[in-house]
Amino acid sequence: MKGRVLVTGGLGYIGSHTAVELLAQGYEVLLVDNLSNTRASVLDGIEAISGKRPEWLQIDLADPAACRSALEGQHLDGIIHFAAYKAVGESVQEPLKYYQNNLGSLMNLLDYVSQHPSCGFIFSSSCTVYGQADQLPITEDAPVKAAESPYGNTKQIGEEIIREVAVARGLRTIALRYFNPIGAHASARIGELPLGVPQNLVPFMTQSAAGLRGPLSVYGNDYPTEDGTAVRDYIHVVDLAQAHIMALERLLAQQNEEALEVFNLGTGKGSSVLEVIHAFERATGASLSWDFAPRRAGDITAAYADTQRASAVLGWTAKKSLDESMRDAWAWQMALG
């Protein structure tokens, strides 16, 4: 066994795929998830893929007493912290809920790590910290701009809290700034499982093509891009999960050069909404109904990653294509029925 790793939000989209990769690499995995944005059945999918059923605790990490009780005596080598509320629109309506949950859970976990400084800590951050960057592709040194939402602000503030605590307590920590995760495990046993109306492009697209939703709305066709639609960096969730393993290995080997290291995770290539639609139809043979709608407030024109630091330092690069991501997302949708 390589080590014992806690994955918070471990039954969520990225957390479940990371748990599968950890198990495949020989780690012992402990999952924590309060099921606020997923279902317990994801555990069955993890077991079906890996042949192992990791321990799962259903607790609220934002509750200091519950968090302390759950982690007491766990002897963790690493924590990968995904658990967070993540709906941008809801965060604008209910900012206090987002600050209490996202920052409360983070601080409770850091309290544990501060008492166990040999435990590496990986934070699920986001490219939202950059806003509309002045230059593309976006490097990790690009200025962090005022957040567009309380959700985005919890990622910015979260990074600062981690940095200050890590410096003060001599901790080893990494923040991974994701671009746009898509796709699903090739087995179609786990994938993105939005409760209610999907907030992200690809699950809405697959549900629409499956006849579960009406036509897809493409928000904005007047952006200063080649086809007028917004451009993002779409990365396969399995590539993303594997980056967490490489980041964890860096921390466990005590190779980090700063108390908090930051890495972008993306493909380095931007794709417009229309390009994603065309890739979906090309890769799956399914047809999609869509129409243009006005831009959404807060949406930026374009964002895609400079991934040189992750490549040079972690030895990680995204391998899966947009078409492969579309095929896997569609297979997952078909498996859901």
Residue ranges and their predicted role:
Residues 9, 57, 69, 81, ...:
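Short, flexible active-site loop motifs that bind/organize anionic cofactors or intermediates
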Residues 99, 148-156, 191, 195-199, ...:
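Short-chain dehydrogenase/reductase
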Residues 114, 192-197, 298, 317:
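A general boundary/transition motif marking the beginning of the first structured unit of a protein
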Residues 201-337:
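C-terminal substrate-binding subdomain of Rossmann-fold SDR/epimerase-dehydratase oxidoreductases
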